[in-house]
Every structure is written in structure tokens, then in C-alpha cells.
Amino acid sequence: MATSMMTTLPQFTGLRPQLKPSPIQGLVAAQPMTRRKGKGALGVRCDFIGSSTNVIMVASTTLMLFAGRFGLAPSANRKATAGLKLETRDSGLQTGDPAGFTLADTLACGTVGHIIGVGVVLGLRTLCM
């Protein structure tokens, strides 16, 4: 019954609506799929899960989390001295991890790992251009 009804659904071209009657098919009006190319300086590519970009991002984030967890990088419980040696201190943050790796450490190391990964990906792209 709903498939034979005619209704006016607003159709947009740019910012201005164009009102024209169109048949309702189920609950969703059928729209043709069109591919649009990015207009900006950066284009988005969705590659497969084993792509080079994905491997770089996973590796850089994993290595940074590993370094933070096992005491190779400064964290909330280990501060760096002037000679870049890590010394243990009490940060006052509660954690259930035996090494004292906190949520703040996880977020910070994950962020730095992503920054390193993006730098590697963009650096390799400029070399290939």
C-alpha cells in the first residue's frame, strides 16, 4: 500500500530545495548512487586492511604503546631527567596495571604513535610523487 502512494519529498540541489512528486518505495526514497571525487587538497582512500598505510599506522601506534608500557618512554609515573634518564615517581593516578600504566599514558602514547604514523605516511607519499 505504501509503495503506490505519491508524496512530495524535498529534493536538494545545492542549498535550494526542489519540490517534485516522487513515489515512495518502502520507507526510503531510492536515490541513484553517484561517485564524487574529492575537491580538496586531501583525498580519502579506503584501502584494504593489509594496505601499507594501515600497516604503518598499526605498527607505529603499537611500538609507541609498547615503549610506554615497558618503561622506554616517559609516562605519568616515569619522568625524564636532564640526562634523559627515566626515574620513577608517584603521580597519584590509580591504575590496576602492575607496571603502573595509566589511562593518561595510554591516550598519550596512542596519540604520539598516530602522529608518528601520519608523519611516515605523508613523508612516503611525498617521496613517491
From Swiss-Prot:
What residue stretch is labeled transit peptide in the record? Answer: 1-46
The alphabetized UniProt keywords are:
Chloroplast, Membrane, Photosynthesis, Photosystem I, Plastid, Thylakoid, Transit peptide, Transmembrane, Transmembrane helix
Segments spanning the bilayer are 48-68, 104-124
Example GO BP: photosynthesis
Which PROSITE patterns does the entry link to? PHOTOSYSTEM_I_PSAGK
Q: How does it sit in the membrane?
A: Multi-pass membrane protein
* Database matches in Pfam families: PSI_PSAK
Looking up InterPro entries in the UniProt record yields: PSI_centre_PsaK_sf, PSI_PsaG/PsaK, PSI_PsaG/PsaK_dom, PSI_PsaG/PsaK_pln, PSI_PsaK_pln
Domain of life, per lineage = Eukaryota
Is-annotated flag, keyword Transmembrane helix? yes
**Main localization (coarse):** plastid
Subcellular localization, per the record? Plastid, Chloroplast thylakoid membrane
Kindly give the PANTHER family that the UniProt entry links to this protein.
Answer: PHOTOSYSTEM I REACTION CENTER SUBUNIT PSAK, CHLOROPLASTIC, PHOTOSYSTEM I REACTION CENTER SUBUNIT V, CHLOROPLASTIC-RELATED
Question: Belongs to which family?
Answer: Belongs to the PsaG/PsaK family.
What NCBIfam families does its record include? PS_I_psaK_plant
Query: What is the official name of this protein in its record?
Result: Photosystem I reaction center subunit psaK, chloroplastic
Q: Which organism is it from?
A: Medicago sativa (Alfalfa)
